[in-house]
Amino acid sequence: MPPSGFYIDDYNSFYFYNKVPGFGGQRQSGFEQFSYTQTPRLMWITPWHILATDFGAAVRIPLVERLYTHSIPYGPPISTFPFPTYNHKTVTDSQFGLSDIQVEPLILAWHLKRFDFVTSYSLWIPTGDWNHNNYIFDNFGQGYWTHSIEFGMTWYLDSEKTWAISLLNHYDINTKQYSTLVNVPVSPSHPLGIASEDTTLGDIYTLEWAVSKTIAKGVDVGVTGYYQQQVTDTEGPTLNGPTWKNEKIHVAGIGPEIKGEYTKWGLSGSLRYAYEFSAMDHPQGHLITLTVTKSF
C-alpha cells in the first residue's frame, strides 16, 4: 500500500474470448466477445498510524463497453424433418453500461524490512443492470451482493528490494440472486403458491501472484498470474443446469508484466497480459490490463 494521500487508479481491461469450457462443449460456434472495462478507483490512505498499521479506504466504479458476435437463424426453415433447421447469419451487437460498484471501507497495511502485508474488506454492490429474463450476455451486473476479504503480501528477496514475490488472496462470499417465480407447496391448506426461487453462487477463492525484478530506476518487469476457483456448491437453479462433469467454476491465467513510475509527477503505471490456459464453466480467453495511477 502506498504512503498516505489521495490516489486515483485508472484500470483499463481488454478481454477477448470465444469459448466457455463446460457450457455444452469447448467452443461456441460463431460466438466471440470483446469487452473493454474502465474502472476508476479512488483511494485514500490516512496519515494515522496505530501500532505500525496504515489505514485506508477505496471505491471502484466499473464502466463496460462490449461487442459480441454471434449466429442467429433467419429465413424460412430449410428442412423440417426430423426437426426444423434454419440458415444462420453472423451479427455483431454492442452494449455500454455501469457494472457492479466495489466499496472498500477498510484497508490495513504493515511494512517491515523485507515484507509488506495488506488486508481489506470490501462489498460489491449490484448496481449493474441485471434481469433474470435477459440473455446472460445482456446483463452488466451479477444481480447479487458479495462480501470480499483480501489478504496479500510482498516478499523482497534482497536488501535493495530489486527482486520481489507478491501474493494476493481473495475470498468472495456471494449472497442470493433472485431467479424466477415458481409454483411451490406452501401448506396443506394451500397446496400451491407463488414463491421466488433463488440461486446462490458458491463462494469464490482467487489467488493472484507475481514475480518481479527491477531492471532500471523506476522500472520493473516480471511474470504474473491468477487462479480462481469456486469452493462451495451453487444452490438453486442455474441457467445452464449443473456444471459440466459436475466441476465447479475455475479459471487460470499467466503472462508478462512491466511497471514504471515517474515520481516527479506522482505517476505510475503497469501493463500486463494474461493468457487463460484453463477454465471450467467460465469464459477462457486473453486479458490485457493497463493501469495508470496518479497521487495527490
Residue ranges and their predicted role:
Residues 32-40, 92-102, 141-147, 199-205, ...:
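Residues that define the transmembrane beta-barrel architecture of outer-membrane proteins
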Residues 27, 177-296:
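Outer membrane beta-barrel transmembrane domains
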Residues 10, 40-46, 103-108, 121, ...:
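Residues on the lipid-exposed face of transmembrane beta-strands in outer-membrane beta-barrel proteins
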Residues 26-48, 54:
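N-terminal low-complexity, intrinsically disordered segments
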Residues 1-27, 44, 188:
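Short glycine/proline- and aromatic-enriched beta-strand/turn motifs that initiate or cap beta-hairpins
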Residues 1-5, 45-56, 70, 110-117, ...:
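Short loop/turn motifs that connect adjacent beta-strands in outer-membrane beta-barrel proteins
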Residues 56, 62-196, 200, 245-248:
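Outer-membrane pore/translocation modules
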Residues 8-14, 57-65, 119-125, 167-173, ...:
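Transmembrane beta-barrel strands of outer-membrane/channel proteins
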